[in-house]
């Protein structure tokens, strides 16, 4: 069946793949719970603060009242199937947001009606911009003291440089909030104050709001008609513009990322969720309306392959998350981009060159599941029992191999040493750590080459705390966990070249390889890159090239200053010498590794440390204390702005090494009245004096 087939078009036209994203505590999970309740998936509304929210199904999530992993679920609304992913808002779990956005077609951005756009909202918004995800906005908590729709709307415009279009305005604010006015339909939606918000009445706009609503409505219509030339002409000619025409034009603007429709409500009080669901259908794209994904040929990376959203095309799917289920084993969440993935068939993973049999396919509802026989293009589900597939891998037909663009993962910035209490626990611990690393690519495992300790690295203190908690609980292990340490990195500042001849006799056989390579500094965000100017041939085979790259990358894991992983280096293989009788993969791996080490010695190595971006909100009386303290922590003050309603917002950057325990210190500096948020910004070169101190502490001087 092709995408022209009416059944396929109907199927996909009525599908939405969406995410719910926001700053921590803006009400994402509560909004999702309401959506599940109103779409009939959940017979009882789960509350985050009671620890029984459906989407928060890990023990750690229910205890902390925050979302850590992206739970995926399917719901139905007005003949449409909606696949929903609830993403975490805490900065330590940015990776979960990143990988969710990679496979979604649209998103609901939830904002706190009291605070408007907050730091993590900005981060998530930028991630959605990166993947060109159309969004609708939901200004939540309109019933809270201090709720201000106009202020929140303004922050979307100013802080996010977006073009928000209000499709609703609230009726009442704070404790008088009782409904919304739909500006396109010019009707009021009033919710019953009692009950679960199932029942609402659609009535005329309240008399005391008519004048204001008419003014707003005219402004909104004037903005919307600009998205369609014919409609603009019609409007300028003084003709009546209908509601369906306005919705069609606003949909066009939303899909082109020129507009972001704004809804409002109070999810906790069950108000405003049904019109938001209508907004998902009216303004967010179906899989047919997003550009076809482009992959490339694994054998020829410069050859592009377009994966069309068609059921009869060759199968291609992206694995975007791995989870371990205590009963089912490994669950691999996939988004199918073209063709159909069926139970019983074998698919190829081009990265590992291994074939995987699709034993079981399931549709997920948070942590319960329903077995299905196939997943078609445009759909999201999970495969049970894949052995060799990781996050960001492609699954495709071996006769039509394709590699889809993978997911980029941030560098971990903080680590702890983990040591099993007994030798019996040691094996269990290593198996448990390997599982965690497979599930969560933003956590890394490495053995310290000096001490032999196992180091678990992650994106922040909370992230590490939860990883360790899961390790101990899920795998029933007793372990000693060290204090969190900063994960330093190393880089080069000048280009260098080296060549190395490896010739050795092992077990009576000679192994020979000669490589010449050059290295140069690149952006730290680009990690370690390797390219070859030497073409694969009969003599210099593809496995030899792969072995040389492997040797290069492994050598970059241990820097010369402090044995830290290296970043920001591009390596180029310039030439090789092959002897047909004695050259081997092992020899090329060793030669490339040793050539890299020789080149690094001449490349002026520097130590890198993670820098964090901070935003501290505090009353005016304590600004001096906070700024003085940040300066003492090697911080850099970037801006100070007056906060609406009083107080100051201080924007700063500071090294992570100086921020351990900052939450406690900031409370005592402000008598408990300051709040702050921080997120990873970049790795930067450590100043010379500080570098000497760090290397002394590491025993490197």
From Swiss-Prot:
GTP binds at residues 22-29, 86-90, 140-143. PROSITE patterns: G_TR_1, G_TR_2. GO terms for molecular function: GTP binding; GTPase activity; translation elongation factor activity. It is found in: Cytoplasm. One of its GO terms (biological process) is ribosome disassembly. The keyword RNA-binding does not apply. Coiled coil: none annotated. Pfam families: EFG_C, EFG_III, EFG_IV, GTP_EFTU, GTP_EFTU_D2. Residues 13-288 form the tr-type G domain. SMART domains: EFG_C, EFG_IV. Keywords: Cytoplasm, Elongation factor, GTP-binding, Nucleotide-binding, Protein biosynthesis. GO terms for cellular component: cytoplasm. The keyword Nucleotide-binding applies. Belongs to the TRAFAC class translation factor GTPase superfamily. Classic translation factor GTPase family. EF-G/EF-2 subfamily. Catalyzes the GTP-dependent ribosomal translocation step during translation elongation. During this step, the ribosome changes from the pre-translocational (PRE) to the post-translocational (POST) state as the newly formed A-site-bound peptidyl-tRNA and P-site-bound deacylated tRNA move to the P and E sites, respectively. Catalyzes the coordinated movement of the two tRNA molecules, the mRNA and conformational changes in the ribosome. This is Elongation factor G 1.
């Amino acid at each position: 069946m092709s995408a022209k087939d009416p059944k396929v078009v109907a199927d996909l036209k009525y599908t939405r793949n969406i995410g719910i994203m926001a700053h921590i505590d803006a009400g994402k999970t509560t909004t999702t719970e309401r959506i599940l309740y109103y779409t009939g998936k959940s017979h009882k509304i789960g509350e985050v603060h009671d620890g029984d929210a459906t989407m928060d199904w890990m023990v750690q999530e229910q205890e902390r009242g925050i979302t850590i992993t992206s739970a995926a679920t399917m719901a139905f609304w007005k003949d449409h199937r909606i696949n929903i992913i609830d993403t975490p808002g805490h900065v330590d779990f940015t990776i979960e947001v990143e990988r969710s956005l990679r496979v979604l077609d649209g998103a609901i951005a939830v904002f706190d009606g009291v605070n408007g756009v907050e730091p993590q909202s900005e981060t998530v918004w930028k991630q959605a911009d990166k993947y060109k995800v159309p969004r609708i906005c939901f200004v939540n908590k309109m019933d809270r003291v201090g709720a201000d729709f106009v202020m929140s709307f303004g922050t979307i415009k100013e802080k996010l440089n977006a073009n928000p279009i209000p499709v609703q305005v609230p009726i009442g604010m704070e404790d008088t909030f009782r409904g919304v006015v739909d500006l396109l339909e010019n009707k009021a939606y009033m919710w019953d104050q009692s009950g679960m918000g199932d029942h609402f009445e659609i009535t005329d706009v309240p008399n005391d709001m008519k004048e204001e609503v008419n003014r707003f409505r005219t402004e909104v219509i004037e903005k919307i008609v600009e998205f369609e030339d014919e409609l603009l002409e019609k409007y300028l000619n003084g003709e009546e513009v209908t509601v369906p025409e306005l919705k069609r034009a606003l949909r066009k603007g939303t899909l082109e990322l020129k507009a972001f429709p704004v809804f409002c409500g109070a999810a906790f009080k069950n108000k405003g969720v049904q019109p938001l669901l209508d907004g998902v259908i009216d303004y967010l794209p179906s899989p047919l309306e997003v550009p076809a994904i482009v992959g490339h040929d694994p054998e020829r990376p410069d050859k592009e392959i377009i994966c069309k959203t068609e059921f009869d095309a060759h199968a291609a799917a992206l694995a975007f998350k791995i989870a371990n289920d205590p009963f089912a084993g490994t669950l691999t969440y996939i988004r199918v981009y073209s063709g159909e993935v069926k139970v019983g068939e074998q698919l190829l993973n081009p990265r590992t060159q291994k074939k995987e049999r699709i034993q079981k396919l399931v549709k997920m509802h948070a942590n319960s599941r329903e077995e299905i026989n196939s997943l078609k293009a445009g759909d999201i589900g999970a495969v049970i029992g894949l052995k060799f597939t990781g996050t960001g891998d492609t699954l495709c037909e071996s006769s039509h191999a394709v590699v889809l663009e993978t997911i980029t993962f941030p560098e971990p910035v903080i680590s702890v040493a983990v040591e099993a209490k007994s030798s019996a626990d040691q094996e269990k611990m290593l198996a448990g750590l390997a599982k965690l690393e497979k599930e969560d690519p933003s956590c890394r495992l490495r053995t310290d080459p000096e001490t032999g300790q196992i180091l678990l690295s992650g994106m922040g203190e909370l992230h590490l705390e939860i990883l360790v908690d899961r390790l101990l609980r899920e795998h029933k292990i007793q372990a000693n966990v060290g204090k969190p340490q900063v994960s330093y990195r190393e880089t080069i500042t000048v280009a260098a070249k080296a060549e190395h001849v490896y010739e050795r006799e092992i077990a009576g056989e000679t192994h020979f390889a000669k490589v010449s390579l050059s290295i140069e500094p690149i952006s730290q965000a680009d990690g370690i890159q390797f390219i070859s100017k030497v073409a694969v041939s009969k003599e210099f085979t593809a496995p030899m090239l792969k072995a040389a790259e492997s040797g290069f990358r492994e050598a970059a894991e241990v820097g010369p200053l402090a044995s830290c992983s290296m970043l920001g280096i591009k390596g180029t293989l310039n030439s090789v010498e092959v002897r047909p009788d004695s050259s081997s993969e092992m020899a090329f791996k060793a030669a490339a590794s040793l050539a890299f080490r020789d080149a690094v010695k001449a490349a002026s190595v520097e130590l890198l440390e993670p820098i964090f971006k901070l935003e501290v909100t505090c009353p005016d009386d304590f600004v001096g204390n906070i700024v003085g303290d940040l300066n003492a922590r090697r911080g850099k003050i970037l801006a100070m702005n007056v906060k609406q309603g009083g107080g100051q917002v201080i924007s700063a950057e500071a090294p992570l090494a100086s921020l351990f325990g900052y939450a406690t210190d900031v409370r005592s500096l402000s008598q408990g009245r300051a709040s702050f948020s921080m997120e990873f910004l970049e790795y930067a070169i450590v100043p010379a004096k500080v570098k000497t101190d760090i290397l002394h502490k590491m025993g490197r001087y």
